[in-house]
């Protein structure tokens, strides 16, 4: 297989984005646009990738250094384009960093949805020292370089929109910005570029006419899916590509048998915090209601049901579990697990380290963080469990909390099996509630309690008969 080097154009400012963030670092599906393109390079098993930076170069280069999640073993290098004098000028900056043999593929850092199969077909079209262009036909080609063909349909040149005459502007086949070039020819063609055009820039597309003049065959690999070569220049375009990408992911899930209530209201994203790729693994008969967002790696077991507007990140939901609407499950880096047949929510929050056993119930406005709940444990209303180990069949009352933080350090609470915690209790860690014990409602527990006993720690009730409320003083 011919050695493959890749140049990624990532120097643009993206003025229309109206953002301080460089355009190629705007996020699609939770991942910077540039990371999507680096993933394309990885899919081609590139030997070397050269990223051409300019606006926000320091940020862009740092973001690339944190792109390990894209896969691939390529050698990553950076070059600066300062000033920015066109696409040809950008590639001129990159060529000294290339090996000089094989094939060079030029990609755009703001074109995130090009499929690996499309790029492989482009490289194949460029086999045998040909110049290969990725093209597409558009109903409105305004702004794009037109593919000008000669007799027999052979590609003769690319004319940029601003330099095209009326006849050329009527052409609907356009250049995508992606090409595969024989490396040994590239440097010579770049040396012949001029900026004698309407924009006063060095156009990379001018090498097409040079190839024709030099007798090098030019192949155009034309695709029918314009989304694969769509770039991002504005928030509206970014939103359009986001929805297109999410629709494609939803369609793939439905092909596997997942029931999506509305595929237009489904999101699967990378987790920017943990770096986990957006991935959802579903067993049979999984149901997902509208408006759900999944980030990082999520597993849904057989028959799991996810209610409307849930956000689930880096978590495993086991078979038969039901997550009711508006629940937030966030495993971040340590993960979260919901056991078989568990009932979660609505409006529940599971934070990193939440590990729930079979048939656990976590109800509305209950928060669980870094805690394990054994099979059959229940916390149904308005409660907090942090840094706790909860035994089987525990019933944890409404309004109860574990006070796990002393202002400097976290401490654990152990609630053994078959304990009943009354409403509005405070368990001040470190503390252990013995198996089978009961804690009376309203208690503040600061010491370990014995198994099987009743523990009450609250002020004694006083009732005053015939008590009269104070009368309001007259105004005046």
UniProtKB/Swiss-Prot annotation:
Cofactor binding note of this UniProt entry: Binds 1 Mg(2+) ion per subunit.
Top-level enzyme category: transferase
Keywords annotated in UniProt: Acyltransferase, Cell shape, Cell wall biogenesis/degradation, Cytoplasm, Magnesium, Metal-binding, Multifunctional enzyme, Nucleotidyltransferase, Peptidoglycan synthesis, Repeat, Transferase
Family: In the N-terminal section; belongs to the N-acetylglucosamine-1-phosphate uridyltransferase family.
Region (Linker) residue spans: 236-256
Gene: glmU
InterPro entries noted in UniProt: Bifunctional_GlmU (IPR005882), GlmU-like (IPR050065), GlmU_C_LbH (IPR038009), Hexapep (IPR001451), MobA-like_NTP_Trfase (IPR025877), Nucleotide-diphossugar_trans (IPR029044), Trimer_LpxA-like_sf (IPR011004)
Upper classification of the organism: Bacteria, Pseudomonadati, Pseudomonadota, Betaproteobacteria, Burkholderiales
One matching Pfam family: Hexapep
Stretches for region N-acetyltransferase: 257-476
Pathway(s) the chain acts in: Nucleotide-sugar biosynthesis; UDP-N-acetyl-alpha-D-glucosamine biosynthesis; N-acetyl-alpha-D-glucosamine 1-phosphate from alpha-D-glucosamine 6-phosphate (route II): step 2/2; Nucleotide-sugar biosynthesis; UDP-N-acetyl-alpha-D-glucosamine biosynthesis; UDP-N-acetyl-alpha-D-glucosamine from N-acetyl-alpha-D-glucosamine 1-phosphate: step 1/1; Bacterial outer membrane biogenesis; LPS lipid A biosynthesis
Record-listed E.C. numbers: 2.7.7.23, 2.3.1.157
Name of the protein in question: Bifunctional protein GlmU
GO biological process: cell morphogenesis; cell wall organization; lipid A biosynthetic process; peptidoglycan biosynthetic process; regulation of cell shape; UDP-N-acetylglucosamine biosynthetic process
């Amino acid at each position: 297989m011919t050695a493959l080097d890749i140049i990624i154009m990532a120097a643009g400012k993206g003025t229309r984005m109206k953002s301080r963030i460089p355009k190629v670092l705007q996020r699609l599906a939770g991942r910077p646009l540039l990371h999507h393109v680096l993933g394309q390079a990885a899919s081609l098993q590139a030997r070397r990738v050269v990223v051409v930076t300019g606006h926000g170069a320091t940020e862009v280069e740092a973001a690339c250094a944190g792109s390990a999640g894209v896969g691939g073993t390529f050698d990553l290098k950076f070059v600066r384009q300062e000033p920015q004098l066109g696409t040809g000028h950008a590639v001129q900056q990159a060529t000294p960093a290339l090996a000089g043999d094989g094939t060079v593929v030029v990609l755009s850092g703001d074109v995130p949805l090009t499929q690996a199969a499309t790029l492989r077909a482009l490289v194949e079209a460029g086999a045998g020292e040909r110049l290969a262009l990725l093209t597409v036909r558009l109903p409105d080609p305004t702004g794009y370089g037109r593919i000008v063909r000669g007799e027999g349909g052979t590609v003769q040149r690319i004319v940029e929109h601003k330099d095209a005459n009326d006849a050329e502007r009527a052409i609907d086949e356009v250049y995508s910005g992606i090409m595969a070039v024989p490396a040994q020819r590239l440097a010579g063609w770049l040396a012949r570029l001029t900026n004698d055009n309407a924009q006063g820039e060095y156009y990379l597309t001018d090498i097409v006419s040079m190839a024709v003049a030099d007798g090098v065959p030019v192949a155009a690999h034309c695709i029918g899916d314009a989304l694969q070569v769509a770039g991002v220049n504005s928030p509206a375009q970014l939103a359009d590509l986001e929805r297109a990408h999410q629709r494609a992911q939803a369609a793939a899930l439905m092909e596997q048998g997942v029931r999506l209530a509305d595929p237009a209201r489904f999101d699967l994203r990378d987790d920017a915090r943990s770096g986990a790729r957006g991935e959802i693994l579903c067993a049979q008969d999984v149901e997902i209601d509208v408006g759900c967002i999944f980030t990082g790696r999520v597993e849904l077991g057989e028959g799991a049901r996810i209610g409307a507007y849930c956000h689930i990140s880096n978590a495993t939901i086991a078979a038969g579990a039901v997550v009711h609407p508006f629940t937030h499950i966030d495993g971040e880096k340590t993960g979260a697990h919901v056991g078989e047949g568990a009932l979660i929510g609505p409006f529940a929050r599971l934070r990193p380290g939440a590990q729930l056993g079979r048939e656990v119930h976590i109800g509305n406005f209950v928060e669980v963080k870094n805690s394990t709940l054994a099979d059959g444990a229940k916390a149904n209303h308005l409660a907090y469990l942090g840094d706790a180990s909860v035994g089987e069949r525990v019933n944890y009352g409404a309004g109860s909390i574990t006070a796990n933080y002393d202002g400097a350090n976290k401490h654990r609470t152990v609630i053994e099996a078959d304990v009943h915690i009354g409403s509005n209790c405070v368990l001040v860690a470190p503390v252990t509630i013995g198996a089978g014990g009961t804690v009376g409602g309203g208690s503040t527990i600061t010491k370990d309690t014995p198994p099987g006993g009743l523990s009450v720690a609250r002020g004694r009730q006083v009732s005053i008969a015939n008590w009269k409320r104070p009368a309001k003083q007259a105004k005046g």
